[in-house]
């Protein structure tokens, strides 16, 4: 998760080491990782699979990559991505709701 990643990055920084973030094969999670990468002083690179079309689940659209291969952090609300709820529903195998009292 984000908290654990930040702890690892800060530990690496305390030893003068870089902490590079790898891809997740789900571009919505990669968008979260992109935000985390930008919050880490000792992160210089962001690994991302291309072509992206095979790794779009569960997000609508692709991450903004320019002609130099640089990804820009979206400035939309939240993490900047939109979930594809129709795709999620088509791939859901069950629904379970738990009522908490």
Could you say what each language-model-derived stretch is?
Residues 1-70:
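Shared catalytic-loop signature of beta/alpha-barrel
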Residues 53-101:
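C-terminal extensions of enzymes
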């Amino acid at each position: 998760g984000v908290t654990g990643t930040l702890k690892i990055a800060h530990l690496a920084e305390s030893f003068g080491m870089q902490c590079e973030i790898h891809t997740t094969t789900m571009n919505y999670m990669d968008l979260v990782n992109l935000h985390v990468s930008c919050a880490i002083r000792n992160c210089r690179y962001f690994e991302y699979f291309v072509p992206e079309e095979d790794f779009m689940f569960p997000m609508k659209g692709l991450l903004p990559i320019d002609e130099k291969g640089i990804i820009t952090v979206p400035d939309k609300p939240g993490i900047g991505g939109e979930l594809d709820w129709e795709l999620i529903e088509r791939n859901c195998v069950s629904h379970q709701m738990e009522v908490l009292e």
